[in-house]
Curated annotation (Swiss-Prot):
Belongs to the zinc-containing alcohol dehydrogenase family. One of its GO terms (molecular function) is aldehyde dehydrogenase (NAD+) activity. This is Alcohol dehydrogenase. PANTHER family: NADP-DEPENDENT ISOPROPANOL DEHYDROGENASE, ZINC-TYPE ALCOHOL DEHYDROGENASE-LIKE. Its EC number is 1.1.1.1, 1.1.1.4, 1.2.1.3. Multifunctional alcohol dehydrogenase exhibiting NAD(+)-dependent dehydrogenase activities for 2,3-butanediol, ethanol and acetaldehyde, and reductase activities for acetoin (NADH-dependent), and diacetyl and acetaldehyde (independently of whether NADH or NADPH is the reductant). The rate of oxidation of 2,3-butanediol is much higher than for the oxidation of ethanol. Has acetaldehyde dehydrogenase activity leading to acetate formation. May function in the release of excess reducing power in the absence of exogenous hydrogen acceptors such as oxygen. The keyword Amino-acid biosynthesis does not apply. It is an enzyme of class 1 (oxidoreductase). Binds 1 zinc ion per subunit. It comes from Cupriavidus necator.
Length: 366
């Protein structure tokens, strides 16, 4: 008789439901992880709304914290019963894309089925959980290429302390890294949701000495100060572009990080940049963008626009855990609510509608 588990699955736009699914069978390079904590991401809400397409019946979620239940025969250096995380991005690090430095765009595992070209590049395909394969909002998840993608959790850290590592922390910090921040730089971070807050923390670690955090929620701006923001601006109370230009003496910021994914925030991120500055884009956009010529100096302003998909792999996760363990960053304040997996539909309703001051929800299957 097939062993079954509970899982949150995409049914159709507007509907994610709890369903019974078979516990995954693993291959020699895989691991089966029993989920102890996972969470809901803004990207999951895009999936819920039908703004990002996935297959019907797919288990959603991409942020796993759990315990190794079973290891494939080729996976070494780990043990059953060990607490681990895996990145939201689980590439095959032998692929062209990974060796080219863009492991998040690795679609090499799709080549045999004809879904990817001969060199294995496919946009966003390195993001497998809840996108290309069944995800983490379930009692169990299959981790592919486990040797390269599992990272042990130190005994002294709780699930909640490392819950941001697989995606939100990795993405936010990548936004700061992509902003080309140098010691003494001034940085504006647009939107202080979970990713923006992590980008604010990452900008501080990268050496920025003046960080301007922008949002329309005063509570989130208070948290931004704890994450390292020196100045907070509520866009409901001021003209953000004017204020940033005043704060910089008309020079503009060295870098801006866009962490929402709207035309308005993208455009503002450009307008506050100094000539030669960098816009680091983290938002997931749902419609075409327009670049205003005046903000972009008609393409002649030496501006740089960098985009990124959350980096993954066990070494990335290890370094993020090191940051948490060092005490330099505490992301515990981002976990504002806890739900059982059985109540996942209610958790989505809360998160998608941004009620009750929600930032991140810890989902507990057991």
């Amino acid at each position: 008789m097939t062993a079954m588990m509970k899982a949150a699955v995409f049914v159709e736009p507007g509907r994610i439901e709890l369903a019974d699914k078979p516990i995954p069978d693993i291959g020699p390079n895989d691991a089966l992880v029993r989920i102890t904590t996972t969470t809901i991401c803004g990207t999951d809400v895009h999936i819920l709304k039908g703004e990002y397409p996935v297959a019907k019946g797919l288990t959603v979620g991409h942020e796993p914290v759990g315990i190794i239940e079973k290891l494939g025969s080729a996976v070494t250096g780990y043990r059953e019963g060990q607490r681990v995380i895996a990145g939201a991005i689980c590439p095959n690090f032998n692929s062209y894309a990974a060796q080219d430095g863009v492991a998040s765009q690795d679609g090499s595992y799709l080549m045999a089925s004809g879904q990817c070209g001969c060199h294995g590049y496919k946009a966003t395909a390195g993001w497998r959980f809840g996108n290309m394969i069944d995800g983490t909002q379930a009692e169990y998840v299959l981790v592919p290429d486990a040797q390269a993608n599992l990272t042990p959790i130190p005994d002294g850290l709780t699930d909640e302390q490392v819950l941001m590592c697989p995606d939100i922390m990795s993405t936010g910090f990548k936004g700061a890294e992509n902003a080309n921040i140098r010691i003494g730089h001034t940085v504006a971070v647009f939107a202080q949701g979970p990713i923006g807050l992590c980008a604010t923390a990452g900008a501080r670690l990268c050496g920025a000495t003046t960080i301007i955090a922008i949002d329309g929620n005063d509570h989130r701006l208070e948290i931004a100060r704890k994450m390292g923001a020196d100045v907070v601006l509520n866009f409901r109370n001021c003209d953000v572009v004017d204020e940033v230009m005043k704060l910089t003496g008309g020079r503009g910021v060295d870098a801006s990080i866009e962490a929402l994914g709207t035309q308005a925030t993208f455009e503002q991120s450009l307008r506050v940049l100094k000539p030669g500055g960098t816009l680091s884009s983290l938002g997931v956009y749902s419609s075409d963008l327009t670049i205003p010529l005046s903000a972009f100096a008609a393409g002649l302003g030496d501006h740089k626009i960098n985009t990124a998909l959350c980096p993954g792999g066990k070494e990335r996760m290890r370094r993020l855990i090191n940051v948490i363990e060092s005490g330099r960053v505490d992301l515990g304040a981002l976990v504002t609510h806890q739900y059982r997996l059985d109540d996942i539909v209610a958790a989505y309703d809360l998160f998608a509608n941004q009620r009750d001051g929600v930032l991140k929800i810890a989902i507990k299957p057991h």
